[in-house]
Design a protein with these regions (language model features):
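Helix-loop-helix hairpin linking two adjacent transmembrane segments in secondary transporters
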Residues: 158-212
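Cytoplasmic helix-loop-helix junction between adjacent transmembrane helices
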Residues: 123-161
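Cytoplasmic membrane-interface "Motif A"-like loop-to-helix N-cap segments
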Residues: 90-101, 319-333
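Extracytoplasmic gate region of multi-pass secondary transporters
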Residues: 48-52, 255-311, 367, 371, ...
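C-terminal transmembrane helical hairpin of 12-TM major facilitator-type secondary transporters
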Residues: 323-370
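Conserved MFS/SLC helix-loop-helix module at the cytosolic interface between two early adjacent transmembrane helices
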Residues: 79-118
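Helix-breaking motifs and short loop linkers at transmembrane-helix boundaries and internal kinks
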Residues: 60, 92, 113-118, 289, ...
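Helix-to-loop junctions at the C-terminal end of transmembrane segments
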Residues: 81-92, 310-322, 410
Length: 463
């Protein structure tokens, strides 16, 4: 099984006259494969949420038990993102991603035939563990095929797969219910999404690509000279082929202050995001006295406003900010701070909805920019490990702070305590955005010095 996940031998070299055309076609296929793959992971993750009313009614599970199941998946997913993303550095991205999808589908089929709570809990944990196999290959693929100047737009396109995947789960499950009927709720909730995921897994295998070299093409550094210096590291004397995934993680990520800075950016972004999304329904219903329909509209705006904002932010970070990601993240977090106060203090139904939509519009931008920054602070062969650290930190600490600690603050101090917590998280996020930006500028300066030194040596050799 493990041997199937390993990178295969390099393909025959593409003839020189076909390199440009092949390169352009392959990288579009690679991007589409990880977009579809990530989208499919959401189909076999978010379907669980849609099944919870039937779990409560048909299997007589309590709200506490359902909450425990959700927490199990969240924790397992956070741990898995850390471990699986590191392992992905040594694997074939398309095989790794497709394998994870198939395993998630198998688990969902198991959920469709389960009736005992503890069996459900075990399968939900397994689903969370296999879900972690989707993120690492996505970032590795983008880092392998797209230069720094394009990663903002490319990362933005890939990032909306989260929103699209989350958005099409309900129509898929709803159509299954319409065809099969509520008496077959387990098939509609679990088995149909599992079948859809398998179809997407096949598309990942067909469209997906390894690194350019594995596909018989020159590397990104050879195709685009400006990338050559970007990938240099002070540890470059040891070939990564001779290092295990753990050694790569320790050498290029664990000791890398910039990897920690960007991970803490994600921690506090997730804290604010989960604090808003987890508590928005109950806050609007009980404090702002929204109707269920009005709350649903506000929730819809919070989620879907992120798509145009993310695409615009990708273009701005590439073009206006010249590949520097954190200044835009700082601007977004500052605006979120202001809108959070408006969301909290406003009594107008319209204004509360508007402020919620703006927060939803902006909160995914720093998250996606942090993911792009991650690809630029480590060499391409360590991207999975860096993504793993970010994923572990964001889910285990960030999501927990936004859900559990927010609830504790509300119980102890009232709703204002929860909002003070989120405001503090925003301030901390801005601080780590600044530190991450400063670290990126230092790397940029080091790259320029290295480039100048190489040019000087080349000139000396020529003379």
């Amino acid at each position: 099984m493990l041997s199937l996940l390993k990178k295969g031998p390099s393909a025959n070299k593409v003839p020189a006259e076909k390199i440009q055309a092949t390169y352009g076609r392959y990288r579009m296929q690679a991007l589409l494969s990880v977009f579809l793959g990530c989208l499919a992971y959401y189909i076999v993750r978010n379907n669980f949420t849609l099944s919870t009313p039937y779990l409560k009614e048909q299997l007589d599970l309590s709200a506490t038990q359902i909450g425990l199941l959700s927490s199990c998946m969240l924790i397992a997913y956070g741990i898995s993102k850390g471990v699986m993303s590191s392992l992905a550095d040594k694997a074939s991205p398309k095989v790794f991603m497709a394998c994870g999808l198939v395993l998630c589908a198998i688990v969902n089929v198991g959920l469709g035939f389960s009736t005992a709570f503890w069996v459900f809990a075990a399968l939900v944990v397994l689903n969370g563990l296999f879900q972690g196999m989707g993120v690492g290959p996505s970032f590795i693929t983008i880092a392998n095929w797209f230069p720094r100047r394009e990663r903002g737009r490319v990362g933005a396109f890939w990032n909306i797969s989260h929103n699209v995947g989350g958005g099409i789960v309900a129509p898929i499950v709803g159509a299954a219910f319409a065809i099969l009927g509520t008496e077959h709720w387990q098939s509609a909730s679990y088995i149909v999404p599992a079948c859809v995921a398998v179809v997407f897994a096949i598309s990942v295998l067909v469209l997906g690509k390894g690194s350019p070299r594995e596909e018989g093409l020159p590397s990104l550094a050879e195709m685009m000279p400006e990338e050559k210096v970007v990938l240099k590291t002070k540890h470059g004397q040891k070939a990564p082929e001779n290092m295990s995934a753990f050694q790569i993680f320790c050498t290029y990520v664990l000791r890398n202050k910039n990897a920690w800075y960007v991970s803490f950016v994600d921690v506090f972004v997730y804290m604010v995001r989960f604090g808003m999304i987890s508590w928005l329904p109950i806050y609007l219903l009980t404090v702002k006295h929204f109707s269920k329909e009005q709350m649903s509209v506000a929730f819809l705006f919070f989620e879907w406003a992120a798509i145009p904002a993310t695409l615009l932010a990708g273009w701005l970070s590439d073009k206006l900010f010249k590949g520097r990601r954190m200044p835009l993240a700082i601007i977004c977090m500052t605006l979120i701070f202001i809108c959070l106060i408006g969301y909290w203090k406003s009594e107008s139904l319209l204004m509360v909805t508007v402020f919620a939509a703006i927060v939803g519009c902006l909160i995914y931008v720093p998250q996606f920019l942090a993911s792009v920054q991650t690809m630029e602070i480590v060499p391409s062969f360590a991207v999975g490990s860096a993504v793993g650290l970010r994923g572990f930190m964001s889910y285990i600490f960030g999501a927990s702070l936004g859900t559990s600690l927010f609830g504790v603050m509300v119980d102890k101090m009232g709703w204002h305590g929860g909002f003070y917590l989120l405001m503090g998280g925003i301030v901390c996020c801005i601080l780590f955005c600044y530190l991450s930006h400063r670290g990126a500028l230092e790397l940029e300066q080091q790259r320029k010095i290295t480039e100048q030194e190489e040019a000087r040596l080349a000139l000396a050799d020529a003379q």
